[in-house]
Design a protein with these regions (language model features):
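ADP-ribose/adenylate-binding Rossmann-like module
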Residues: 38-51
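Core SAM-dependent methyltransferase catalytic element
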Residues: 64-82
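A short SAM/SAH-binding and catalytic strip from SAM-dependent methyltransferases
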Residues: 13-25, 45
C-alpha cells in the first residue's frame, strides 16, 4: 500500500505518483480522498496502452483528466479534483 494511507485526514494540493498501472488503479481512491478540491494528481510509470484504464479509473474516483503526455511508449496523466 502507498504512503497515502498513512496520512489520513490530511489534504494536499498536489500528489505525484510514479508507479505501475495496477498500483495506481488500486490506490486511486486514496489519492482522490487525499486531494483537496482543485488539487492536481500527476501519474506516470505506465505504458501508453494503459492510458484509457487510468483515465476511466480517475473519472470513477471523481478526478477529471486534463492532460496526457506520451514518450517512448510511456505515459503521464494529469488529473484534477473537481
Amino acid at each position: 500500500a502507498s504512503d497515502v494511507y498513512k496520512r489520513q485526514g490530511r489534504k494536499y494540493d498536489f500528489i505525484a505518483a510514479n508507479i505501475n498501472r495496477n498500483i495506481l488503479t488500486m490506490d486511486m481512491p486514496a489519492y482522490a480522498e487525499a486531494l483537496d478540491t482543485g488539487g492536481d494528481l500527476l501519474m506516470s510509470g505506465f505504458l501508453e496502452e494503459d492510458v484509457p484504464v487510468i483515465e476511466a479509473r480517475a473519472r470513477a474516483c471523481g478526478l477529471d483528466p486534463i492532460e496526457v503526455r506520451m514518450r517512448d511508449g510511456w505515459a503521464m496523466v494529469h488529473v484534477k479534483k473537481a
